[in-house]
Amino acid sequence: MSASISTQPAYDVAVIGGGLLGAAVAYGLAGLGLKTLMVDEGDIAHRAARGNTSLVWVQGKGHGCPAYTAWTVRAAEAWPVFAAELNELTGVDANYRRTGGLKFCLGDTEFESRHRLIDSIETESPAARSEMLDRQALLDIYSEIGPQVTGASYNPMDGQVNSLLLWRALHQGFQQHNGQYLPRHSVGSIRQIGNAFELVAGNETVWAEKVLLAAGIANARLAAQVGLNGGVRPVRGQVLVSEKLQSRFAVPATDLVQTDAGGLLIGNVEEDAGLDESTNIRVLSGMARRAVATFPSLESVQLVRSWAALRVMTEDGNPLYQRSESHPGAFAASTHSGVTLAPLHATVLARWIAGLEMDPAVEAFRPEQRHVH
Protein backbone atom coordinates (compact mmCIF):
# COMPACT_ATOMS: atom_id res chain seq x y z
CA MET A 1 0.00 0.00 0.00
CA SER A 2 1.62 3.22 -1.09
CA ALA A 3 1.29 6.53 0.71
CA SER A 4 -1.36 8.84 -0.68
CA ILE A 5 -0.50 12.39 -1.69
CA SER A 6 -4.11 13.52 -2.09
CA THR A 7 -6.96 14.14 0.32
CA GLN A 8 -9.25 12.13 -1.95
CA PRO A 9 -10.32 9.30 0.38
CA ALA A 10 -9.19 5.88 -0.78
CA TYR A 11 -11.60 4.19 1.66
CA ASP A 12 -15.15 4.74 2.77
CA VAL A 13 -14.25 3.75 6.33
CA ALA A 14 -11.00 3.07 8.15
CA VAL A 15 -11.39 0.93 11.27
CA ILE A 16 -8.57 1.32 13.77
CA GLY A 17 -8.30 -1.92 15.73
CA GLY A 18 -8.43 -5.54 14.67
CA GLY A 19 -9.68 -7.18 17.85
CA LEU A 20 -13.14 -8.67 18.19
CA LEU A 21 -14.89 -5.30 18.28
CA GLY A 22 -13.04 -3.74 15.35
CA ALA A 23 -13.14 -6.93 13.30
CA ALA A 24 -16.89 -7.38 13.82
CA VAL A 25 -17.72 -3.83 12.71
CA ALA A 26 -15.26 -3.98 9.81
CA TYR A 27 -16.78 -7.28 8.70
CA GLY A 28 -20.22 -5.69 8.76
CA LEU A 29 -19.13 -2.55 6.91
CA ALA A 30 -17.40 -4.54 4.18
CA GLY A 31 -20.48 -6.74 3.90
CA LEU A 32 -22.53 -3.61 3.22
CA GLY A 33 -20.32 -2.96 0.22
CA LEU A 34 -18.28 -0.15 1.76
CA LYS A 35 -14.60 0.03 0.88
CA THR A 36 -13.18 -0.69 4.31
CA LEU A 37 -9.67 -0.70 5.73
CA MET A 38 -8.82 -2.38 9.03
CA VAL A 39 -5.59 -1.13 10.63
CA ASP A 40 -4.31 -3.53 13.28
CA GLU A 41 -1.28 -3.52 15.55
CA GLY A 42 -1.26 -7.31 15.30
CA ASP A 43 0.29 -9.51 17.96
CA ILE A 44 1.86 -6.58 19.81
CA ALA A 45 -1.60 -5.23 20.64
CA HIS A 46 -3.22 -5.68 24.05
CA ARG A 47 -5.71 -8.31 22.88
CA ALA A 48 -8.66 -8.23 25.26
CA ALA A 49 -9.91 -11.57 23.92
CA ARG A 50 -6.92 -13.30 25.53
CA GLY A 51 -8.29 -12.38 28.94
CA ASN A 52 -11.81 -13.73 28.70
CA THR A 53 -13.29 -17.21 28.74
CA SER A 54 -15.25 -16.89 25.48
CA LEU A 55 -18.71 -16.60 26.99
CA VAL A 56 -21.83 -15.28 25.30
CA TRP A 57 -23.36 -13.90 28.47
CA VAL A 58 -26.59 -12.21 29.53
CA GLN A 59 -26.98 -12.74 33.26
CA GLY A 60 -25.73 -10.05 35.60
CA LYS A 61 -25.27 -7.42 32.89
CA GLY A 62 -27.01 -4.06 32.85
CA HIS A 63 -27.73 -3.46 36.51
CA GLY A 64 -28.96 0.12 36.64
CA CYS A 65 -28.89 0.33 32.83
CA PRO A 66 -31.86 -1.51 31.28
CA ALA A 67 -30.67 -0.45 27.83
CA TYR A 68 -27.53 -2.58 28.29
CA THR A 69 -29.56 -5.56 29.44
CA ALA A 70 -31.84 -5.24 26.40
CA TRP A 71 -28.82 -4.84 24.09
CA THR A 72 -27.23 -7.98 25.56
CA VAL A 73 -30.44 -10.02 25.25
CA ARG A 74 -30.78 -8.90 21.65
CA ALA A 75 -27.20 -9.99 20.95
CA ALA A 76 -27.70 -13.41 22.55
CA GLU A 77 -30.82 -13.93 20.46
CA ALA A 78 -28.88 -13.03 17.30
CA TRP A 79 -26.00 -15.41 17.96
CA PRO A 80 -27.34 -18.63 16.35
CA VAL A 81 -27.96 -16.96 12.98
CA PHE A 82 -24.72 -14.98 13.19
CA ALA A 83 -22.62 -18.08 13.90
CA ALA A 84 -24.26 -19.97 11.04
CA GLU A 85 -23.68 -17.04 8.65
CA LEU A 86 -19.98 -16.86 9.50
CA ASN A 87 -19.59 -20.61 9.14
CA GLU A 88 -21.32 -20.66 5.76
CA LEU A 89 -19.24 -17.77 4.42
CA THR A 90 -15.82 -18.71 5.76
CA GLY A 91 -15.98 -22.40 6.59
CA VAL A 92 -14.78 -21.53 10.10
CA ASP A 93 -16.97 -23.01 12.82
CA ALA A 94 -16.58 -20.85 15.93
CA ASN A 95 -18.22 -23.61 18.00
CA TYR A 96 -21.04 -21.47 19.35
CA ARG A 97 -23.32 -23.36 21.75
CA ARG A 98 -26.32 -22.04 23.65
CA THR A 99 -26.01 -24.19 26.75
CA GLY A 100 -27.32 -21.90 29.45
CA GLY A 101 -24.87 -20.54 31.98
CA LEU A 102 -24.19 -20.49 35.72
CA LYS A 103 -22.66 -18.21 38.32
CA PHE A 104 -21.77 -20.38 41.32
CA CYS A 105 -22.23 -19.04 44.84
CA LEU A 106 -20.10 -20.20 47.76
CA GLY A 107 -21.80 -19.65 51.11
CA ASP A 108 -25.03 -17.92 52.06
CA THR A 109 -23.66 -14.39 51.76
CA GLU A 110 -22.70 -14.84 48.11
CA PHE A 111 -26.03 -16.48 47.32
CA GLU A 112 -28.05 -13.70 48.94
CA SER A 113 -25.98 -10.98 47.27
CA ARG A 114 -26.35 -12.62 43.87
CA HIS A 115 -30.08 -13.09 44.48
CA ARG A 116 -30.51 -9.38 45.15
CA LEU A 117 -28.61 -8.46 41.99
CA ILE A 118 -30.58 -10.84 39.78
CA ASP A 119 -33.90 -9.72 41.29
CA SER A 120 -32.99 -6.08 40.70
CA ILE A 121 -32.06 -6.69 37.07
CA GLU A 122 -35.19 -8.77 36.49
CA THR A 123 -37.34 -5.98 37.93
CA GLU A 124 -35.74 -3.48 35.56
CA SER A 125 -35.62 -5.85 32.57
CA PRO A 126 -37.92 -8.91 32.72
CA ALA A 127 -36.59 -10.08 29.34
CA ALA A 128 -33.26 -10.91 31.00
CA ARG A 129 -34.76 -14.24 32.15
CA SER A 130 -32.19 -15.03 34.83
CA GLU A 131 -33.16 -17.07 37.87
CA MET A 132 -31.63 -18.38 41.06
CA LEU A 133 -31.12 -22.10 41.62
CA ASP A 134 -30.77 -23.37 45.16
CA ARG A 135 -28.32 -26.15 45.97
CA GLN A 136 -30.86 -28.91 45.41
CA ALA A 137 -31.80 -27.62 41.96
CA LEU A 138 -28.14 -27.19 41.07
CA LEU A 139 -27.40 -30.80 42.01
CA ASP A 140 -29.67 -31.85 39.15
CA ILE A 141 -27.19 -30.20 36.76
CA TYR A 142 -23.91 -30.95 38.54
CA SER A 143 -24.02 -33.67 41.17
CA GLU A 144 -20.30 -33.20 41.89
CA ILE A 145 -20.46 -29.73 43.45
CA GLY A 146 -18.70 -29.21 46.75
CA PRO A 147 -20.38 -28.65 50.13
CA GLN A 148 -19.63 -24.90 50.09
CA VAL A 149 -21.75 -24.37 46.98
CA THR A 150 -25.09 -22.94 48.08
CA GLY A 151 -26.57 -22.41 44.63
CA ALA A 152 -26.12 -20.42 41.44
CA SER A 153 -27.76 -17.96 39.13
CA TYR A 154 -28.78 -19.37 35.76
CA ASN A 155 -29.80 -17.98 32.39
CA PRO A 156 -30.93 -20.17 29.47
CA MET A 157 -29.69 -17.66 26.86
CA ASP A 158 -26.08 -17.86 28.02
CA GLY A 159 -23.56 -19.96 26.15
CA GLN A 160 -20.03 -20.12 24.83
CA VAL A 161 -17.98 -19.80 21.67
CA ASN A 162 -14.34 -20.23 20.73
CA SER A 163 -13.28 -16.56 20.67
CA LEU A 164 -10.07 -17.26 18.74
CA LEU A 165 -12.03 -19.01 16.00
CA LEU A 166 -14.56 -16.17 16.08
CA TRP A 167 -11.72 -13.69 15.56
CA ARG A 168 -10.38 -15.77 12.68
CA ALA A 169 -13.82 -16.04 11.05
CA LEU A 170 -14.42 -12.28 11.29
CA HIS A 171 -11.05 -11.48 9.74
CA GLN A 172 -11.50 -14.06 7.00
CA GLY A 173 -15.06 -12.92 6.30
CA PHE A 174 -13.93 -9.30 6.19
CA GLN A 175 -11.36 -10.09 3.52
CA GLN A 176 -13.84 -12.26 1.60
CA HIS A 177 -16.03 -9.14 1.48
CA ASN A 178 -13.06 -7.36 -0.16
CA GLY A 179 -11.98 -5.58 3.00
CA GLN A 180 -8.34 -4.44 3.13
CA TYR A 181 -6.23 -5.45 6.11
CA LEU A 182 -3.15 -3.52 7.26
CA PRO A 183 -1.49 -5.50 10.09
CA ARG A 184 1.48 -4.60 12.28
CA HIS A 185 0.73 -0.88 12.07
CA SER A 186 -0.10 1.42 14.96
CA VAL A 187 -1.94 4.63 14.14
CA GLY A 188 -0.09 7.60 15.59
CA SER A 189 -2.07 10.56 14.30
CA ILE A 190 -5.47 11.32 12.80
CA ARG A 191 -6.35 14.59 11.07
CA GLN A 192 -9.49 15.67 9.27
CA ILE A 193 -8.67 17.60 6.12
CA GLY A 194 -11.61 18.60 3.99
CA ASN A 195 -13.90 15.63 3.50
CA ALA A 196 -11.36 13.03 4.55
CA PHE A 197 -9.38 11.72 7.49
CA GLU A 198 -5.63 11.31 7.22
CA LEU A 199 -4.30 8.39 9.26
CA VAL A 200 -0.57 8.08 9.77
CA ALA A 201 0.51 4.59 10.81
CA GLY A 202 4.26 4.16 10.83
CA ASN A 203 5.46 4.78 7.29
CA GLU A 204 1.95 4.50 5.86
CA THR A 205 -0.50 7.33 5.29
CA VAL A 206 -4.05 6.44 4.32
CA TRP A 207 -7.18 8.47 3.68
CA ALA A 208 -10.77 7.58 4.52
CA GLU A 209 -14.11 9.35 4.44
CA LYS A 210 -14.97 8.00 7.90
CA VAL A 211 -12.93 6.58 10.75
CA LEU A 212 -13.90 4.26 13.61
CA LEU A 213 -11.76 4.03 16.71
CA ALA A 214 -12.10 0.45 17.94
CA ALA A 215 -8.60 0.16 19.35
CA GLY A 216 -9.44 -0.86 22.89
CA ILE A 217 -7.19 0.82 25.42
CA ALA A 218 -5.58 2.88 22.65
CA ASN A 219 -8.89 4.73 22.18
CA ALA A 220 -7.88 6.78 25.22
CA ARG A 221 -4.88 8.06 23.24
CA LEU A 222 -6.60 8.54 19.89
CA ALA A 223 -10.04 9.89 20.80
CA ALA A 224 -9.01 13.48 21.56
CA GLN A 225 -7.59 13.82 18.04
CA VAL A 226 -11.13 13.66 16.64
CA GLY A 227 -12.97 15.47 19.42
CA LEU A 228 -14.07 12.41 21.37
CA ASN A 229 -13.62 11.17 24.93
CA GLY A 230 -11.53 8.02 25.28
CA GLY A 231 -13.40 7.03 28.43
CA VAL A 232 -11.66 3.66 28.89
CA ARG A 233 -9.20 2.06 31.28
CA PRO A 234 -7.39 -1.29 31.29
CA VAL A 235 -8.60 -4.07 33.57
CA ARG A 236 -6.40 -7.13 33.98
CA GLY A 237 -7.88 -10.58 33.72
CA GLN A 238 -6.02 -13.80 34.53
CA VAL A 239 -6.67 -17.29 33.21
CA LEU A 240 -5.62 -20.78 34.30
CA VAL A 241 -5.87 -23.71 31.89
CA SER A 242 -6.09 -27.34 32.94
CA GLU A 243 -5.03 -30.48 31.16
CA LYS A 244 -7.63 -31.98 28.83
CA LEU A 245 -10.37 -33.66 30.83
CA GLN A 246 -12.46 -36.70 29.99
CA SER A 247 -15.37 -35.47 32.07
CA ARG A 248 -17.57 -32.85 30.47
CA PHE A 249 -18.71 -29.57 32.00
CA ALA A 250 -21.70 -29.10 29.73
CA VAL A 251 -22.98 -25.87 31.27
CA PRO A 252 -20.33 -23.12 31.49
CA ALA A 253 -19.94 -20.84 34.48
CA THR A 254 -18.46 -17.37 34.81
CA ASP A 255 -15.21 -18.77 36.18
CA LEU A 256 -15.21 -22.36 34.85
CA VAL A 257 -15.48 -22.99 31.12
CA GLN A 258 -14.49 -26.15 29.27
CA THR A 259 -13.14 -25.55 25.79
CA ASP A 260 -14.04 -27.66 22.78
CA ALA A 261 -10.55 -29.21 23.08
CA GLY A 262 -11.31 -30.45 26.61
CA GLY A 263 -9.24 -28.11 28.77
CA LEU A 264 -10.86 -26.14 31.56
CA LEU A 265 -10.49 -22.35 31.62
CA ILE A 266 -10.51 -20.98 35.16
CA GLY A 267 -10.76 -17.29 35.83
CA ASN A 268 -13.09 -14.38 36.39
CA VAL A 269 -11.00 -11.69 38.05
CA GLU A 270 -10.84 -8.00 37.27
CA GLU A 271 -7.85 -6.02 38.55
CA ASP A 272 -6.76 -2.43 38.19
CA ALA A 273 -3.10 -3.00 37.33
CA GLY A 274 -2.38 -0.36 34.72
CA LEU A 275 -0.70 -1.84 31.66
CA ASP A 276 0.90 -4.69 33.62
CA GLU A 277 0.10 -7.98 31.85
CA SER A 278 2.02 -10.21 34.26
CA THR A 279 0.32 -12.92 36.27
CA ASN A 280 0.03 -12.83 40.06
CA ILE A 281 0.52 -16.09 41.96
CA ARG A 282 -1.69 -14.93 44.83
CA VAL A 283 -4.59 -14.27 42.47
CA LEU A 284 -4.02 -17.48 40.52
CA SER A 285 -3.96 -19.49 43.76
CA GLY A 286 -7.24 -17.92 44.82
CA MET A 287 -8.81 -18.83 41.48
CA ALA A 288 -7.63 -22.42 41.82
CA ARG A 289 -8.91 -22.71 45.40
CA ARG A 290 -12.34 -21.46 44.38
CA ALA A 291 -12.47 -23.94 41.49
CA VAL A 292 -11.67 -26.82 43.87
CA ALA A 293 -14.26 -25.58 46.37
CA THR A 294 -16.82 -25.64 43.57
CA PHE A 295 -15.78 -29.04 42.20
CA PRO A 296 -13.58 -30.98 44.68
CA SER A 297 -12.65 -33.48 41.95
CA LEU A 298 -10.54 -30.76 40.33
CA GLU A 299 -7.98 -31.00 43.15
CA SER A 300 -6.16 -33.77 41.28
CA VAL A 301 -6.30 -32.05 37.89
CA GLN A 302 -3.03 -30.67 36.52
CA LEU A 303 -2.82 -27.03 35.48
CA VAL A 304 -0.74 -26.56 32.35
CA ARG A 305 -0.79 -22.85 31.52
CA SER A 306 -1.61 -19.43 32.88
CA TRP A 307 -1.57 -15.94 31.46
CA ALA A 308 -2.93 -12.44 31.96
CA ALA A 309 -4.43 -9.96 29.53
CA LEU A 310 -5.81 -6.45 29.58
CA ARG A 311 -9.49 -5.98 28.94
CA VAL A 312 -11.21 -2.69 28.15
CA MET A 313 -13.53 -1.11 30.71
CA THR A 314 -15.55 2.05 30.22
CA GLU A 315 -16.15 4.41 33.12
CA ASP A 316 -19.55 2.89 33.99
CA GLY A 317 -18.98 -0.60 32.58
CA ASN A 318 -21.55 -0.15 29.81
CA PRO A 319 -20.78 0.00 26.07
CA LEU A 320 -19.76 3.40 24.75
CA TYR A 321 -20.56 4.37 21.16
CA GLN A 322 -19.59 7.88 20.08
CA ARG A 323 -20.10 10.10 17.04
CA SER A 324 -17.97 13.22 16.84
CA GLU A 325 -19.69 16.58 16.47
CA SER A 326 -16.46 18.50 15.85
CA HIS A 327 -15.10 15.96 13.34
CA PRO A 328 -18.09 14.64 11.32
CA GLY A 329 -17.43 11.11 10.18
CA ALA A 330 -15.38 10.10 13.22
CA PHE A 331 -16.75 7.41 15.53
CA ALA A 332 -15.49 5.44 18.53
CA ALA A 333 -16.67 2.21 20.13
CA SER A 334 -15.59 0.64 23.41
CA THR A 335 -16.89 -2.33 25.38
CA HIS A 336 -15.69 -5.26 27.47
CA SER A 337 -18.37 -7.48 25.86
CA GLY A 338 -16.80 -7.93 22.44
CA VAL A 339 -17.72 -11.62 22.28
CA THR A 340 -21.34 -11.34 23.36
CA LEU A 341 -22.10 -8.22 21.31
CA ALA A 342 -20.33 -9.31 18.11
CA PRO A 343 -23.55 -10.00 16.14
CA LEU A 344 -24.86 -6.50 16.82
CA HIS A 345 -21.54 -4.84 16.15
CA ALA A 346 -21.45 -6.54 12.74
CA THR A 347 -24.99 -5.46 11.87
CA VAL A 348 -26.65 -2.67 13.87
CA LEU A 349 -23.48 -0.77 14.76
CA ALA A 350 -22.05 -1.14 11.25
CA ARG A 351 -25.25 0.27 9.74
CA TRP A 352 -25.18 3.16 12.24
CA ILE A 353 -21.63 4.07 11.23
CA ALA A 354 -22.50 3.69 7.54
CA GLY A 355 -25.35 6.17 8.04
CA LEU A 356 -27.98 3.66 6.98
CA GLU A 357 -29.85 3.26 10.26
CA MET A 358 -30.05 5.35 13.43
CA ASP A 359 -31.05 2.60 15.83
CA PRO A 360 -32.26 3.98 19.18
CA ALA A 361 -30.46 1.12 20.92
CA VAL A 362 -27.11 2.47 19.72
CA GLU A 363 -28.03 6.05 20.53
CA ALA A 364 -28.67 4.97 24.14
CA PHE A 365 -24.95 4.33 24.60
CA ARG A 366 -23.75 7.71 23.38
CA PRO A 367 -22.20 9.89 26.12
CA GLU A 368 -25.02 12.41 25.83
CA GLN A 369 -27.51 9.72 26.90
CA ARG A 370 -25.57 8.45 29.93
CA HIS A 371 -27.62 10.54 32.36
CA VAL A 372 -30.86 8.71 31.52
CA HIS A 373 -29.49 5.42 32.80
Residues of each region from the PLM?
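Active-site lid/adjacent beta-loop-alpha segment flanking the redox-cofactor pocket in flavoenzymes
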Residues: 245-328
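Helical element adjacent to the flavin cofactor pocket in flavoenzyme catalytic cores
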Residues: 153-202, 206-209
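N-terminal Rossmann-like FAD-binding beta1-loop-alpha1 element of flavoenzymes
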Residues: 13-37
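Dinucleotide-binding Rossmann-like beta1-alpha1 core, especially the glycine-rich loop
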Residues: 54-137, 141, 290-292
